[in-house]
Each structure stands twice: as structure tokens, then as C-alpha cells.
């Protein structure tokens, strides 16, 4: 089962797939929070299933070769990595509350997340920017950068410290 849904659904869908005897490939971020991640791991063990978390750069032949060169010492001893993303995201506006479209089962879409009055800013890509459904740009893009840094350094445990900087400098929207 491949899971590519809003973040707030990842854990339940993965657990249900394991219960159904299916292996799982889940897009980033694997879960919405740490508790859900632990429950996914428990389900994988309990039902003897494979649950794989996917990030973009792991599938790139060029990146795999670069990481191999890095780990083979081509540029010496690498002791620090920085993941940087400079991306302007478009203004999503302040669309406010509106009528749920007849083509959307909003209760099903919300699923395990709190039921909020419908807003066009909660669905489609914009759900990323609302904590009930997504993890902001850290969960949307930071996962890829963190993975690449850890992979390049050859570390298999979480970092002790991460620094993040950023802000909302341009748009006055509901992100």
C-alpha cells in the first residue's frame, strides 16, 4: 500500500494496512507526531509487515553516488551538514469559512483530525500549513533536507540539536 495523503492520515492508514496484511510505503513525513510514529512501528512488528518511509532524494541515482563519494572520504572528513531551502511560497490568502463543496466528504477528509469549519485553505495543497492536518514547511520540505544531511554524514540516530530559522516576511495570509 502506498500512502500519499495529508499527514494527519498517515499513521491510521499505515496501521490499517498492516492489520490487513499489507506492506506499506508512506510518503514524508511518516507521521504527524512521535506518538503516531511509535504506533506505526508497533503495528509493523505486531503484524510482521514492512513499513518504509520515503523521501525524495533517496531515489536519485546522482544523489546516491554523491553520498557514496562523500562517505568514502572524497572531500575529507565531513563533520557537519546544513540543509537549506530557499523557496517562496505563494500567498494562500485569507479565504475564511465557506460552504463545503458537494464533491467533498469533509468529515471523511478530516478523519482523525479535529473537525473545523470548512475553509478552502484547509484542503488540497494548503493543508500543509495548518497543524491539524500538516507539519508546516519543516514537515513538508525539512524532512528531505534533514534526511540528506544525516545520510551524507552516515549517522543513524537523530541529531542532538537542530537549528531552524525563517519567518513570514511577505504574505498576510492564514499560513
Stretches with model-predicted labels:
Residues 52, 79-82:
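A short, conserved acidic/glycine-rich loop-to-beta-strand motif
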Residues 11, 15, 38, 60-64, ...:
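A structural signal for well-ordered alpha-helical segments within the folded catalytic domains
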Residues 82-126:
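Core domains of carbohydrate- and sulfate-ester-processing enzymes
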Residues 10-11, 33, 60-61, 88-90, ...:
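Flexible loop/turn segments at secondary-structure boundaries
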Amino acid at each position: 500500500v502506498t500512502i500519499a495523503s495529508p499527514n494527519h492520515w498517515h499513521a491510521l492508514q499505515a496501521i490499517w494496512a498492516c492489520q490487513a496484511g499489507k506492506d506499506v510505503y508512506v510518503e514524508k513525513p511518516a507521521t504527524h507526531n512521535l506518538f503516531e510514529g511509535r504506533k506505526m512501528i508497533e503495528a509493523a512488528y505486531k503484524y510482521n509487515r514492512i513499513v518504509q518511509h520515503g523521501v525524495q532524494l533517496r531515489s536519485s541515482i546522482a544523489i546516491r553516488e554523491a553520498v557514496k563519494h562523500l562517505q568514502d572520504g572524497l572531500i575529507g572528513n565531513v563533520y557537519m551538514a546544513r540543509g537549506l531551502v530557499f523557496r517562496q511560497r505563494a500567498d494562500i490568502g485569507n479565504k475564511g469559512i465557506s460552504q463545503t463543496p458537494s464533491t467533498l466528504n469533509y468529515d471523511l477528509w478530516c478523519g482523525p483530525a479535529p473537525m473545523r469549519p470548512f475553509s478552502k485553505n484547509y484542503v488540497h495543497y494548503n493543508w500543509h500549513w495548518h497543524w491539524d492536518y500538516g507539519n508546516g514547511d519543516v514537515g513538508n520540505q525539512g524532512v528531505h533536507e534533514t534526511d540528506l544531511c544525516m545520510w551524507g554524514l552516515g549517522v543513524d540516530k537523530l541529531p542532538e540539536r537542530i537549528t531552524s530559522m525563517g519567518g513570514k516576511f511577505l504574505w498576510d495570509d492564514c499560513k
